[in-house]
Amino acid sequence: MVGPRLRDARQRAGLTLRATADALGVSVGTWSAVENGRTRITADRVAAAASLFGADVEILVTPDAAPPQAAGTWRDFPPLDLPPPLAGALSAFVELGYHGATIRDVAQRAQLSVPGLYHHWPTKQHLLVALLDRTMDELLTRAEAARAEGDGPVERFTLLVECLVLFHTHRRELGFIGASEMRGLEEPARSRIAALRVGLQRMVDAEVREAGRRGLFTTPLPHEAARAVVTMCTALPTWWSPAGPTPPATVAAQYVEFALDVVRARRPQAG
């Protein structure tokens, strides 16, 4: 399918879903549907996307040019590849905070001059919006893939928890600013990105609610329990460190058990 190849090309180009949609003159929802294979794309728009991404249009449209996304790839985390300005901004915002970091701090980390940075990124706000767009774009793509692998609400719930934990450990810096710097966003970006976060929460809400309806989760407070589970996962960047003794996969397995306890999952009886 052309959609996953377009997504891969966009991510290699360091472009967010929002920036791509704006450049191609479509809505974010439409471009997301294209990348996920839920809607068709015209040849002209494929060509425009290829030009935007600096990709070969023939590779994008040839069925055998790239393998389809394999099951489980949402668990794979290659090194984060950001353009230098965004990598510099991420480093500065994590270390100094959005309000504490200056454009000069970002430029130094990006190994650019201040005028050179301003040429492409006129304000810190543009950098923050791009980083949070990238964060939510990757997280939602992974969460949708994880959820799609599940057979029934309990498995979908546990896969979503695993996905959240893996993202907030492997992508700890993105997760950190996602939790700490929402207050720095200005409108309309703040409302738009907040809506994406709500959409992620609703994925978990839906599985907890359905498992409760089937008698598989017994919490009397499914709404609150689902929010507690997501908050527990998104808080990981505040304490987990790659230098610590527990690798991401182990943390994920532990948190799945914690989450099942929170929702009071029915466990098989011993013996």
Question: Which residues does each predicted region cover?
Answer:
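Short, amphipathic alpha-helix enriched in basic
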Residues: 4-12, 76-105, 109
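Helix-turn-helix
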Residues: 24-30, 36, 92, 96-126, ...
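DNA major-groove recognition helix of helix-turn-helix/homeodomain DNA-binding modules
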Residues: 42-59
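Hydrophobic alpha-helical connector segments
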Residues: 84, 130, 145-173
